[in-house]
Amino acid sequence: MRVMAAMSGGVDSSVAAARLVAEGHEVIGVHLALASTPTTLRVGSRGCCSLEDSGDARRVADALGIPFYVWDFSDRFREDVVDPFINSYEMGETPNPCLRCNEKIKFQALLDRGIALGFDAVATGHYARLKDGELRRAIDDNKDQSYVLGVLNDEQLAHCLFPLGDTRKPDIRKEAEAAGLVTASKPDSHDICFIPDGNTKAFLGNHIGVRSGDLKDQDGNVIGHHDGIYGFTIGQRKGLGLPGPAPDGKPRYVTDIDADTGTVTVGTRDDLRVGRLYADRLIRLDEHEGSTQECQVQVRAHGGVVDATVTIDDGVATIDLHSPLTGVARGQAAVIYRPDPDGDIVLGSGTICDTVSVSKLQPTTAGASSNS
């Protein structure tokens, strides 16, 4: 099989490429250059698109004896990932750019070019499994990345390889050390690659500018002001800019963001509890149109799952949670799973477009305990 190994410069993609070579596939290594200018490359940072990462990926490819290429997808990355990220915050949403990058860059732009060049598949170092054409959770629950792959469609999955899905992370590092790969002890990346200092608010402020609005309590009283809704996300507690503590002394959290009026509403933790989600922009859920199923839903990359009743109607998923979630924001992905003893199966995903608080639902719609 002719395989493109997407090599980020980290230990996971390095071992994935090494395994493919050992299995006898015809492999080339590809590193994606996503920064638009040299100043945005994160020299020395722990990420997936810095100059250091590119060099590490090249050294691994040389050690494996495979061709290595750097493909410039910076324009596509700006258009399909960075700009939508900014626009989403302008609309009061909280997007995950890594999911968008997987959907539009790593498994669309890269795959399209690879197929045009005669390759059969793209392989990455993601922790997930493909079995009988179904995307499943990885063996290593602590590293499972099926959530961030829930945005892939059937055609993309048909050309994917995830060589690490049956292995735990500590064993991957041991394998890299045994093979003498330079990335064996390299730390994992956790930040957003195009925000090198991790200051999302400053990044958005530089692109959007000041757009003042009001901070209100649950009764609609103005209790403060802000410079832009992009500085807030649902569930946020710190940095609200309130002039003083709440009268009852309880912490205050962001409970709603209204992009039309520029209003940010705050309340107690109880006000954050939601019992129903609505999701649109559905992926791989068309076959379930008109159906109601008992499933599980995950709304954060490193969050837990909750049981839910999912109804698909007219391209929108209504997700009734069996126990409440807190801090759920519009723009997050809701990935739907079907429990399975051989690894939970990803049925598909949608983008959360609305939520309903527990207080607005019948008491029996969602349970009494909260999950984060």
UniProtKB/Swiss-Prot annotation:
Gene Ontology molecular function: ATP binding; tRNA binding; tRNA-uridine 2-sulfurtransferase activity
EC number from the UniProt entry: 2.8.1.13
Subcellular location: Cytoplasm
Residues the record lists as binding ATP: 6-13, 32, 125
Keyword Kinase among record annotations: no
Reactions catalysed, as given in the entry: S-sulfanyl-L-cysteinyl-[protein] + uridine(34) in tRNA + AH2 + ATP = 2-thiouridine(34) in tRNA + L-cysteinyl-[protein] + A + AMP + diphosphate + H(+)
Lineage: superkingdom: Bacteria
Region (Interaction with tRNA): 143-145
Keyword terms, alphabetized: ATP-binding, Cytoplasm, Disulfide bond, Nucleotide-binding, RNA-binding, Transferase, tRNA processing, tRNA-binding
Disulfide partners: 101-193
Site (Interaction with tRNA): 126, 332
Keyword Lyase attributed: no
InterPro entries assigned: MnmA-like, MnmA-like_C, MnmA-like_central, MnmA-like_central_sf, Rossmann-like_a/b/a_fold
Active site positions: 101 (nucleophile), 193 (cysteine persulfide intermediate)
GO biological process, one term: tRNA wobble position uridine thiolation
GO cellular component annotations of the record: cytoplasm
Broad enzyme group: transferase
Purpose of the protein: Catalyzes the 2-thiolation of uridine at the wobble position (U34) of tRNA, leading to the formation of s(2)U34.
Family (UniProt): Belongs to the MnmA/TRMU family.
PANTHER family in alphabetical order: MITOCHONDRIAL TRNA-SPECIFIC 2-THIOURIDYLASE 1, TRNA 5-METHYLAMINOMETHYL-2-THIOURIDYLATE -METHYLTRANSFERASE
Protein name: tRNA-specific 2-thiouridylase MnmA
Organism: Corynebacterium kroppenstedtii (strain DSM 44385 / JCM 11950 / CIP 105744 / CCUG 35717)
